[in-house]
């Protein structure tokens, strides 16, 4: 009840207060109205002085009440609220143009700096796509980090750096001017500058500078490159060295050039001033400038010498007649024309001696299909693989070539052995057969140089009949060549016409081979098949006894040769199945790793419960090399194990089984227990380089430390004549480099085997050997013995941090003095301006004048700096910067073959004047008129003069780089920088790495 009586009372009180407030507001309005009327009456009827007094009192009252609207809490005048400073509006067109500039730059980098050397070792089209994706990932990560950078802090640090630099330069200039009256030399100015301020650690000596640049590149790649790229030690070492020596150091040298600084200022600020006058708009597309006009056809006639009789003619050697309406061909095509005419006689000469090569009809050994073709003992086409086998494709063009080649094969009467390396052909021409004497000589060399390797040839008798039938098939005269099925026409469209060094082996006796036209032979890589793949006819055809080197010596082990076929399991195959034949060598340890990895997968564990693996099959057998009976028993059981796994679709299509069978990977890589993430770029580069070395040096060095046996051990082992004959014709392929990638002491193994097989020491004289030993001793003395495990390339943290000591201390003091002040940038800018005004306007440098300027113009300058930084870092500007950089490297979109001629002193002086005028245009016109044109010009001249010393500019570049790395959150990872290139700075270790890779 009490609550009910209280609530009406409270409601009455609130209602009465509301009424009183309304009355008071109405009274105020009445008072104001009366006051205005009274003033009007006084103005019209009474004294004018009284009106002036009343108006002055009202102005004072308004100023007191309205001060909060103009002045902030700090007591500064906010003029920016009355002066509008516009920023660049967001423009989708600018974003699109920036993306285009990035894509063009990436494509030009890949075209001129990546594919220029990669095409010399491989023509894998997927490499370009992988490289482009990796570089785009790097750019995306860089843009993400740049988007979260505190622009306020960046501007503060840069202004502080400029202020410290300008002050140090003025002091150094005064110190050198006092010492001597003659003109100051650049070296003397740099010495005086170093006495005033501590130079960047990278400027101590050239070696330290290279080390510092290498560490920065390594850090940037580690943080920005998407995983798993550059995870391998060798790959990252190569990329770091290439970028450091060919990109970063030349770029720093270019940026430190005073003339280049003038050009940059003219290009940026002149364009910026023009855009400000015309209105903000995105930069126009420059696609017309980037792509020079190239005529579509040229009157090009290439005359070729007539080929010897009995050799098939090639369309590439026929005269080519092209017409053109263009008045003159482009220089690039003229150079290509000269190169073709100049290289053609040499290529024909190489063709005569049998050392020519081609990628058009060249047997390609870079794919994963025939990575172990050298040990294809059981293949019925092993002898036929020594021939020049042409790819059967549709069309009159290739059909004529195949018929000519088969006719040449039929007339030769002798087979040319290639020792597993494939036929060698000139580009655009097919292979030729060597005379019989060359064949016999090649076989004799093969017998003498072949390593001693034990190979089981249990299936040899079964395959001899197949070999005879296929040989008879080729000997049939006037037999038309079968055309390639229509399902493989896409190969002709892509222009990829490569051959494998060996024809695929036909199935075993369970599926006898038919004529060549009864099956579709695919010589394409199945690294990225169009559909699921069915594994069939899997068998372990033989064993190889090899050796590996460890700390105690050589230890033998057994490799099991696994062969299988793959068929694309597609519903739209229209009756024609695409067959591919694979061979891979695996040791027993890798079978155990396969079983372990399958058991660790929860989704696959249920499928292998009833499959007996190696652990269950051989509980009592030792791990070492065993006698032939146990090896034969193990071979049959391991074959049964693999067949059971492939019979289960879920396991057969699993990543583990396909990696074990080297279906989508390189067969040279070992199958380890824990999979090591290697990017496709690293795999393709390693595969291409290794295959190129195999082709270039087929017999110079052993392919693995287990390939060659000593003569004493060979003599101590009883062998039959049949095995000796088989071993003299075959050698162990390089498909088992894999243990070197999976064992801790891999480098020592590869280094040892390459030095052991190196024949350089056999031709060195005694004096050469002594000089070599002396050089190695000196290199070993250079290496720090006290810290052998420390990464020499890893830049010490003090190198990065100490370069910013002065700037960081100043920034910390500013942050401590006013961490939340609204005019931090303006305060730093005023300090920088005082250095410029001290000589011309000393009356402006007094303390009272500084406080007055800070109160009146502080917030306005702060706002102006923020807007200018936003405008200079907008997408329109980034597109312009990237375009300028790209045009400086690729003028007209083409990388110049020769360096540009040096600029004359007159050109440099003219550019300096233009840069000075561009800086003058940055200031508003009314401010220039107030301060004086000549005095402003003298101040800006002092700024340009401080950038005329290349060493000082280099010091500033490194300091600025440290600031950017810190704000990009990269400098915090210096201590975590992986020792991926630990041998890069040590000459002795560098040699070791170069040999081991």
UniProtKB/Swiss-Prot annotation:
User: Is the Zinc keyword given for this protein?
Assistant: no
State the residue spans of region: Disordered. Answer: 313-333, 413-437, 697-728
Supply one GO BP term. exocytosis
Q: Residue ranges of the PX domain?
A: 538-668
Q: Which GO terms describe its cellular component?
A: early endosome membrane
Its annotated compartments are: Early endosome membrane; Cytoplasmic vesicle membrane
Basic and acidic residues composition-biased segments: 714-724
Going by the UniProt record, its keywords in alphabetical order are: Cytoplasmic vesicle, Endosome, Exocytosis, Lipid-binding, Membrane, Protein transport, Transport
| Residue sites binding a 1,2-diacyl-sn-glycero-3-phospho-(1D-myo-inositol-3-phosphate) per the record | 587, 634
Topology in the membrane? Answer: Peripheral membrane protein
Query: Per its record, what are the GO molecular function terms?
Result: phosphatidylinositol-3-phosphate binding
Q: Where is the composition biased (Acidic residues)?
A: 422-435
What are the residue boundaries of the PXA domain, all occurrences included?
95-273
Q: Provide the family line.
A: Belongs to the sorting nexin family.
The record's function comment reads:
Plays a role in intracellular vesicle trafficking and exocytosis. May play a role in maintaining insulin-containing dense core vesicles in pancreatic beta-cells and in preventing their degradation. May play a role in insulin secretion. Interacts with membranes containing phosphatidylinositol 3-phosphate (PtdIns(3P)).
* Assembly and binders: Interacts with PTPRN.
Q: What does the UniProt entry state concerning the protein's domains?
A: The PX domain mediates specific binding to membranes enriched in phosphatidylinositol 3-phosphate (PtdIns(P3)).
This chain's protein is named Sorting nexin-19
What's the source species for this entry? Mus musculus
As recorded in Swiss-Prot or TrEMBL, the protein's gene is named: Snx19
């Amino acid at each position: 009840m009490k609550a009910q009586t209280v609530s009406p009372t409270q409601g009455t009180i609130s209602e009465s207060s509301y009424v009183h407030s309304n009355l008071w507001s109405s009274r105020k309005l009445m008072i104001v109205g009366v006051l205005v009327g009274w003033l009007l009456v006084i103005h019209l009827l009474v004294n004018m002085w009284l009106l002036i007094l009343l108006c002055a009192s009202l102005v004072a009252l308004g100023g007191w009440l309205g001060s909060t609207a103009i002045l902030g809490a700090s007591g500064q005048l906010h003029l920016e609220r009355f002066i509008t400073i516009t920023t660049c509006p967001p423009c989708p067109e600018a974003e699109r143009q920036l993306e285009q500039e990035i894509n063009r730059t990436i494509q030009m980098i890949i075209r001129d700096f990546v594919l220029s050397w990669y095409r010399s070792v491989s023509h894998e089209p997927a490499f370009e796509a992988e490289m482009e994706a990796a570089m785009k990932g790097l750019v995306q990560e860089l843009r993400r980090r740049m988007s979260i950078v505190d622009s306020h802090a960046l501007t503060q640090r840069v202004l502080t750096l400029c202020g410290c630099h300008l002050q140090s330069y003025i002091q150094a200039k005064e110190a050198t001017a006092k010492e001597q009256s003659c003109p100051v030399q650049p070296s003397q100015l740099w010495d005086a500058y170093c006495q005033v301020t501590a130079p960047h650690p990278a400027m101590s000596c050239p070696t330290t500078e290279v080390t510092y640049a290498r560490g920065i590149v390594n850090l940037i790649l580690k943080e920005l490159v998407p995983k798993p790229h550059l995870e391998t030690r060798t790959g990252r070492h190569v990329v770091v060295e290439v970028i450091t020596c060919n990109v970063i150091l030349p770029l720093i040298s270019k940026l430190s050039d005073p003339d280049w600084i003038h050009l940059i200022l003219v290009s940026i600020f002149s364009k910026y001033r023009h855009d400000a006058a015309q209105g903000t708009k995105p930069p126009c597309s420059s696609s017309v400038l980037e792509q020079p006009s190239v005529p579509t056809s040229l009157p090009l006639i290439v005359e070729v010498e007539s080929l010897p009789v009995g050799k098939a003619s090639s369309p590439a050697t026929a005269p080519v007649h092209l017409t053109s309406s263009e008045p003159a061909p482009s220089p690039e095509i003229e150079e290509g024309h000269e190169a073709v005419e100049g290289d053609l006689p040499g290529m024909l000469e190489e063709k005569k001696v049998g050392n020519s090569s081609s990628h058009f009809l060249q047997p390609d050994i870079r794919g994963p299909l025939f990575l172990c073709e050298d040990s294809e003992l059981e293949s019925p086409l092993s002898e036929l693989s020594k021939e020049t086998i042409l790819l059967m494709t549709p069309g009159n063009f290739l059909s004529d070539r195949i018929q000519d080649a088969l006719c040449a094969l039929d007339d030769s009467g002798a087979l040319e052995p290639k020792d597993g390396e494939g036929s060698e052909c000139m580009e655009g021409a097919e292979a030729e057969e060597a005379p019989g004497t060359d064949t016999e000589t090649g076989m004799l060399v093969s017998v003498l140089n072949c390593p001693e390797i034990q190979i089981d040839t249990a299936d040899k008798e079964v395959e001899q009949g197949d070999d005879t039938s296929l040989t008879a098939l080729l000997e049939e005269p006037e037999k038309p060549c079968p055309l390639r099925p229509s399902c493989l026409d896409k190969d002709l469209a892509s222009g990829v016409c490569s051959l494998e060094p060996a024809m695929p082996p036909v199935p075993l006796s369970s599926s006898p081979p038919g004529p060549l036209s009864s099956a579709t032979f695919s010589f394409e890589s199945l690294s990225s098949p169009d559909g699921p793949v069915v594994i069939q006819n899997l068998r372990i055809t033989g064993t190889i006894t090899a050796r590996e080197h460890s700390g105690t010596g050589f230890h033998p082990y057994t490799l099991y040769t696994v062969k299988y076929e793959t068929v694309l399991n597609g519903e739209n195959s229209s009756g024609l199945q695409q067959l591919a034949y694979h061979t891979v060598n695996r040791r027993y340890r890798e079978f155990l790793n396969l079983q372990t990895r399958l058991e660790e997968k929860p989704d696959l564990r249920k499928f292998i419960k009833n499959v007996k693996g190696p652990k269950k099959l051989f509980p009592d057998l030792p791990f070492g090399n065993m006698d032939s009976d146990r090896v034969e028993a193990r071979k049959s059981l391991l074959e049964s194990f693999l067949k059971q796994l492939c019979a289960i679709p879920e396991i057969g299509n699993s990543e583990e089984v396909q990696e074990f069978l080297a279906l989508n990977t390189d067969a040279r890589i070992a199958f380890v227990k824990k999979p090591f993430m290697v990017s496709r770029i690293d795999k393709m580069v390693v595969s291409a380089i290794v295959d190129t070395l195999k082709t270039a040096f087929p017999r110079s060095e052993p392919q693995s430390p287990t390939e060659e046996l000593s003569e004493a051990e060979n003599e101590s082992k009883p062998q039959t004549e049949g095995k000796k004959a088989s071993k003299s014709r075959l050698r162990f392929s390089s498909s088992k480099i894999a243990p070197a990638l999976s064992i801790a002491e891999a480098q020592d193994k590869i280094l040892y085997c390459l030095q052991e097989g190196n024949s350089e020491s056999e031709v060195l004289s005694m004096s050469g050997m002594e000089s070599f030993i002396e050089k190695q001793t000196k290199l070993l003395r250079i290496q720090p013995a006290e810290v052998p495990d420390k990464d020499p390339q890893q830049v010490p943290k003090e190198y990065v941090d100490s370069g910013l000591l002065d700037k960081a201390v100043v920034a910390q003091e500013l942050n401590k003095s006013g961490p939340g002040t609204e005019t931090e940038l303006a305060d730093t800018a005023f300090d920088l301006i005082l250095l410029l005004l001290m000589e011309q306007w000393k009356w402006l440098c007094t303390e009272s004048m500084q406080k007055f300027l800070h109160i009146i113009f502080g917030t306005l300058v702060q706002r102006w700096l923020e807007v200018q930084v936003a405008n200079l870092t907008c997408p329109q500007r980034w597109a312009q910067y990237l375009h300028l950089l790209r045009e400086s490297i690729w003028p007209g979109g083409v990388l110049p073959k020769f360096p540009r001629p040096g600029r004359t002193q007159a050109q440099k002086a003219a550019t300096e004047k233009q840069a000075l005028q561009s800086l003058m245009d940055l200031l508003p016109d009314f401010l220039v008129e107030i301060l004086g044109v000549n005095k402003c010009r003298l101040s800006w001249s002092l700024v340009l003069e401080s950038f005329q010393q290349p060493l000082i500019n280099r010091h500033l570049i490194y300091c600025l780089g440290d600031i950017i790395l810190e704000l990009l959150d990269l400098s915090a990872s210096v201590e975590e920088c992986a020792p991926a290139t630990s041998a890069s700075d040590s000459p002795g270790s560098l040699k070791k790495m170069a040999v081991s890779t």
